[in-house]
């Protein structure tokens, strides 16, 4: 059969809330069995997390990200598991041959998220202002396609999309309609952590270049790219746990120390980024070990 097929049978959701932390798997058909979906309305804010190529929603970094969100702000976290369509289950040495297939599946997975969103908005009365999408690598583009589709469906825009080192190959030279783009949500936040698996291209409302967007400190000499690529997920989880611990300085002022930052020109990476007025590209110096903080006690 075709490799890495996408259909509604090959994608599932892991739902985590404070009351239900058992990370059970749901499909579109079984969603109404989740306690939260037995209610008439859902009042808490929702975050969708989407993994990338050859990954899954059960990878440690995504479990930690989900946990950080639920602990911090009482979100309902819906982790999209599209591992079959992301070629995770293909023979180890052959996975990379199927990258173009996984890349082309991103639009379908995005439309799937839009379908769930439509249900949340129409049936459960959730406001689009209360829905955020966080996607890593190919999952960042999935989130972008979801953002385009909900606008087509006249639902409005998601409040925010956070692209964690959006995939470069197959996407970086695409026009806005064929990749994650700053018009896909009210606010699009990008973390750049690798320049081969990711991309240096400006994609968002704010683009954070972590350690210049290239090799991340502490990633060593071997498998540096893969390590750097996944660091974006780890940084975001840390930024949720420790508010304002990573501060971005405008690229035009990147020679200045973080200590010179003001609320007007610098921006904190994470869920509060959009509260800061500054837009554009930012340089973020990063430590080599968790929690990676660069603020040295400074809070802007």
From Swiss-Prot:
GO terms for molecular function: phospholipase A1 activity. Disulfide bonds join 4-87, 176-181, 219-227, 244-268, 245-293, 261-266. InterPro entries: AB_hydrolase_fold, Allerg_PlipaseA1, Lipase, Lipase_N, TAG_lipase. This is Phospholipase A1. Catalyzes the hydrolysis of phosphatidylcholine with phospholipase A1 activity. May act as an allergen and induce hemolytic activity. Its main location: secreted. Keywords: Allergen, Disulfide bond, Hydrolase, Lipid degradation, Lipid metabolism, Secreted. It comes from Vespula germanica. Its EC number is 3.1.1.32. CDD domains: Pancreat_lipase_like. The active site is at residues 137, 165, 229. It is found in: Secreted. One of its GO terms (biological process) is lipid catabolic process. One of its GO terms (cellular component) is extracellular space. Expressed by the venom gland. It is an enzyme of class 3 (hydrolase). It catalyses: a 1,2-diacyl-sn-glycero-3-phosphocholine + H2O = a 2-acyl-sn-glycero-3-phosphocholine + a fatty acid + H(+). Belongs to the AB hydrolase superfamily. Lipase family. It holds the Pfam family Lipase. It comes from the Eukaryota. Signal peptide: none annotated.
